[in-house]
Amino acid sequence: MDRIAVRAKRKELGISCMLNTEVGAVLAVIRRPLSESYLSPQETDHCDSSVQQSLKSLRALIFNPQQDWRTIDPSVYLSPFLEVIQSDEIPASATAVALSSILKILKIEIFDEKTPGAKDAMNSIVSGITSCRLEKTDLVSEDAVMMRILQVLTGIMKHPSSELLEDQAVCTIVNTCFQVVQQSTGRGDLLQRNGRYTMHELIQIIFSRLPDFEVRGDEGGEDSESDTDEIDMSGGYGIRCCIDIFHFLCSLLNVVEVVENLEGTNVHTADEDVQIFALVLINSAIELSGDAIGQHPKLLRMVQDDLFHHLIHYGASSSPLVLSMICSCILNIYHFLRKFMRLQLEAFFSFVLLRVTAFTGFLPLQEVALEGLINFCRQPAFIVEAYVNYDCDPMCRNIFEETGKVLCRHTFPTSGPLTSIQIQAFEGLVILIHNIADNMDREEDEGNEEDDNNSNVIKPSPVEIHEYIPFWIDKPKEDFETWVDHIRVRKAQKRKLAIAANHFNRDEKKGLEYLKYNYLVSDPLDPMALASFFRFTPGLDKTMIGDYLGDPDELHLSVLRSFTHTFEFTGMNLDTALRTFLESFRLPGESQKIERMIEAFSERFYDQQSSDIFASKDTVHILCYSLIMLNTDQHNPQVRRKMTEDEFIRNNRAINAGNDLPKEYLSELFQSIATNAFALSTHSGPVEMNPNRWIELMNRTKTTQPFSLCQFDRRIGRDMFATIAGPSIAAVSAFFEHSDDDEVLHECVDAMISIARVAQYGLEDILDELIASFCKFTTLLNPYTTPEETLFAFSHDMKPRMATLAVFTLANTFGDSIRGGWRNIVDCLLKLRKLQLLPQSVIEFEINEENGGSESDMNNVSSQDTKFNRRQGSSLMGRFSHFLALDNVEESVALGMSEFEQNLKVIKQCRIGQIFSKSSVLPDVAVLNLGRSLIYAAAGKGQKFSTAIEEEETVKFCWDLIITIALSNVHRFNMFWPSYHEYLLNVANFPLFSPIPFVEKGLPGLFRVCIKILASNLQDHLPEELIFRSLTIMWKIDKEIIETCYDTITEFVSKIIIDYSANLHTNIGWKSVLQLLSLCGRHPETKEQAVDALIGLMSFNASHLSQSSYAYCIDCAFSFVALRNSSVEKNLKILDLMADSVTMLVKWYKTASTDTANSYSPASNTSSSSSMEENNLRGVNFVHHLFLKLSEAFRKTTLARREEIRNRAVTSLEKSFTMGHEDLGFTPSGCIYCIDHVIFPTIDDLHEKLLDYSRRENAEREMRSMEGTLKIAMKVLMNVFLVYLEQIVESAEFRTFWLGVLRRMDTCMKADLGEYGDNKLQEVVPELLTTMIGTMKEKEILVQKEDDDLWEITYIQIQWIAPALKDELFPDEEI
């Protein structure tokens, strides 16, 4: 404790010594004469008796203080020094020393805010410093004193007790400092610089305390005046001094200087130096105050009104330096106070930044404005907030869209080298694009972390308006999701309103109908809706608005009243309000219309006036009419004698309820109209920010929703980018084209990828446009260059290779969002192949054709989020960095790399193969577009082939890619292949379509797809049907196809029949396979393979045949056995297999019969069971139909030239009838029908053939061969007849049938063989008749009956056929 006490005592002694030193210094300077004649002894005594005595008294107390210095009233040791400063008899040098003494006292902080008397002491210091008096001296000494004053002022504000200063004292300090700045003008740069620095420091100190000022609970109303009373006066300075100082700083923006122009007259212009100084101080105040300004209404209103008005007024016409400072100030306001500055910020962009950037006169100013725009774009939330608050509000300008288009417009290169402003604009555009892309990716990342099925998934459909929602009413942000939908609808309304304005300007009726059709106005019509349309929609014809509002119809009058209610005239003068009203339309020429419109205005203006100057609205009405007439009088060149002010006042006497209006008021109105005419333009156009419009804007702030602070939403991001997508792509493409700098090219590609990152969320047309734009830089699609020129450009210029890498990178990364762009990609791919820059290794795909990926595997892949996000960005751009690093030609040459190897390295980085091998993750629509492009390219659309070989190779290449896609997407074959099939049909109708290479190269691939589908054994049979449908149209396109491709077709068809017949389930599949097998079996080279395949099918895989496919199998088998040069052994095998196939018919018949029997059960007595019964009956009939088809095949085969085959066909026919006798359930009529249509024609055809040979010369061998076959056929007839006899005898048609049998016996018996001798059938027929009639007698079918003439007919026919048999067959019987 003793050591602490000693240390404190030493500190107190040090303070005493310091004070003693300062007193001595001041006294020494006072006593020192400046010159021998300067001071007389009397004057020295006078100084000693007043100021010196005070200093001496202080010295007497210094070393004997009664208490600690921190507890002593500071005025005790400050007042002597202040007396020196305030004395006008003290030399300037002594004043300077006294100021230094006070500064030292403040710096070592002898007292603090808790010291008794500290507040009075601080205020006395301020009072003493600001009332400092100097005797006349030289300028250098005065400057030295002023420098000391500035230091002391700063010391005062930095002292801990400064918070005890009164508001007036703080304002005095600032004012004193500014006076020093002003007085230093022209006296020296050093003093002025120090003065400005001090002022800046004071502002920083004062406004840094603003966030700590307490806000009273009753503060916050728009008209609250609590700003000036919220801090207790005993607590030191507060918001009141901040308001006064800020007001003072704003007023500095209006400081003018008088300059002489070229004409020799003096004009007043803004003092730029003072403006810059003021802007620096205002910037500091806003930066340090932050959002605390928003807690103090009066200060906030000053920023909203005074400051913003000044900044906008001077911004558009200032120098680059001033504009730069203004932009910085506005950016700070945006950062801290944008919630309160919605309309003000819009006005700044509209009247300053966008206007200056559009003006092409002064490039430095334009560059500063552009930099201001870019600085805003650098703010993380600016672009989305600008879009939400302005672009989505029908009453505001499209700030975001216009900003983006301004950057695009300035990015576009000209014919010369790139300028600084173009580079700057490009950087801004890239920032904007990256901002949108990063935010959309960031939201996706956050959404995936929270929930894989988050609610913000992008829907590709645009916003549609389905109901009437008042477009002029904004909705506060409560629920974010609902609010996002609301602003998207408002943006859609805004677009529709622009279209409606266009319609309205051309035809009023069509414009109003368009409004109703798009739910922009209600039905029945709401007058406010139409009034808001007239009031807030830009681009409307003002003449048409005036004509509509002036119409006397009741609806038009209602709209007029609503129209006037959209104006806020509170606080406006009459002339200002009338100007604002008349600027929104053009007054019609009819006086009655003008009358109605002025009446509506007068009523609205009168209702919103707080003053008592007008007795009634009639007064306003009369005065408005008078002002309009005055405007015409003063500004119409045809009026020679102008009305004077006195005449105007005299004309308006006694209009205020019989009394006169104040003469001063009328005089002000007259001067306003005389000097500034009403703006009565016809069309909407650019306007200036004048005081009238500013008042209107401030009135609108009372009813407008505050600036919405919102987070990024991917739906909003997609919509906002769509507004600038076209210009952005064009600008980036043009910049890429005109730039040769590697870094700039890299930035262009980076921007292109970011555009694609945004476009993948439902903006597919934009991505297609991007790809088409960059494909032209590859030089691969230039139709006017030769392959050699293209190859040279590709090999020696980095830009084409970089563009190629970019295009295929987009295809790999964003292929799921590409639509029409696939055509350009395919064209580039084909050109690379034509240039031999595409080695086979690049496009070798590993696709398992036999098994492929399962559907569950594909679902796992597709369930993953395939969207590109920023986590992929580093690797993607890393590829381009690697590309740029390897693109050094000299380095490549040093490494021994040829041009081909360099190009190959680029192509390998393109990963072209993955586009197709990984197409399973592409969405359906992307697969459709990619396939369409490839099919059309394979058909030759857009291609020019120099040789047939080139055409064949190109077609094969395209088909390889098509098949790769199909093989990779078998799991969703039903989705995309129907469209592919339509594309195949379409290309067949192309004018220059060449079917041979197209089908020849396509068929093998289609068979590969077919085999994979069959190998997959899918539950759904539609893929099988689809692929066979395409195969069918392919080989039917041209009759030469089979001749060209028979070997390939045979190979694949045989494989399908042998290995995958169990998986063939469709009718068209079996039909196609067996038809192709039949056609290919006609060729000697493939005949044996085709026949073996059929025999294998019928021998080992016949169980896989269905009733439908059985018919095609029989047709195919018949086609083989009917061939003349086919193997007899194999044909006989086929005939045996055909006969044995009756067992399959029996099986199907029994199944159908069983089902039919079950359908008759009592429980099935419903309509559904009846339908089932009908189906089963159709099944039975179909089996009988198949039996007939089989028999018909045998019948046709009986006419074959080779005897072995004919005879086997006849016996097979008998075998089939015999096997189906009992098990196929033929009815009597059915049996007769089969024999009548198969066996009878067989005998007839053989008999006719026999007679034909008998008439030919040297044809005895053939005739005898045919005769032998006919014998067998006759025996078959007898055997079949006897087998089916008991069934057919029950038929009513048996008599006719029996006559048919006898007729054929007679025909064969009497066949005349001519010169070749006897007919050996005469030996067979009697035997056959004997057997048949004998059997019929045994079964008592052929007996004499009174009511049956069968016996009689037979008896008579036998006498004609073989009379010798009559006695044998009918020994005891006679007619």
UniProtKB/Swiss-Prot annotation:
GO terms for cellular component: cytosol; membrane; pollen tube. SUPFAM superfamilies: ARM repeat (SSF48371), Sec7 domain (SSF48425). Preferentially expressed in mature pollen grains and growing pollen tubes. PROSITE patterns: SEC7. It holds the Pfam family Sec7. It is a peripheral membrane protein. Disruption phenotype: Failure of pollen germination. It is found in: Cytoplasm, Cytosol; Membrane. Homodimer. This is ARF guanine-nucleotide exchange factor GNL2. It comes from Arabidopsis thaliana. The gene is GNL2.
